[in-house]
Amino acid sequence: MPIDASILAARDTRRMPLIQSGSVRHNLAPFQPKSAYAGALLLLGDWEGAHTAAQDVHTPEGSYWHAIVHRQEPDSFNAGYWFRQVGKHPIFPAVLADAEAILQRFPSARVKLPAAWSPQFFIDLCESAVRQPGSQLEAAAIEIQHAEWCHLFDWCRNPV
């Protein structure tokens, strides 16, 4: 039986690590829209499956999932390439708004966000965060990544 994709979009779901830590087995049958499948696999910890699924979606959303996969690899150069393929995505303003709210809860993270959401800025922030395990910066980056995931997954399910 396929999983109900709406369960994955809940804001209180598990948080993904900033760097992938291997693959897991799952019983997640592909669901529609196809662009959301890569995100579901990523949330479930199936990095390789998410990578394969993202490669098969030739849309800005597929490129976005592909970029997140490479950001978690971590391969900042490849992540940057895929984010450039995305261009300016409609979820960017919402991700920025959530990032601003999240960072208010983590004042010692000392992050000054750009005026507009910048995927490259977030790649760099994640790279810094993983070098500071247990820090407020790492916790904030994980929360921002989760907000980004929620916005992209919701967009894939119901593009405006």
Predicted stretch roles:
Residues 1-59, 85, 89-160:
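N-terminal alpha-helical interaction modules that lie
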Residues 63, 76-78, 91-95:
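Short, solvent-exposed secondary-structure capping/transition elements
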